[in-house]
Amino acid sequence: MAWIALTVAGILEVVWAYAMKLSDGFSRPVPTIVTFVAMFLSFGLLAYAMKSLPLGTAYTVWTGIGAVGAFVVGIVVLGEAVTVVRVLAAVLIVSGLVLMKVSSPA
């Protein structure tokens, strides 16, 4: 259950990052509210996951999901540039996440 909570927490990190971008410096009410609700839920699920997962594993996976997810949303939704170096960086992050998962005791 901790891994499911951690995965959802990571996805919610992507949601709040995207909503924050849409909030235009917190000047637009709906994206601002979505940002803070998603942050609250993301942190809550991360805290739940940390009850049974090691700190380093949980935090690394959470930030990794957020980083790669924001990268993908930036490209797919916002039309950000795709370069070989950026894609390689995302692949390395995902590789690290897989290694953290397979080496975790929980």
Predicted feature descriptions by range:
Residues 1-106:
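Polytopic alpha-helical membrane proteins, predominantly small-molecule transporters/carriers
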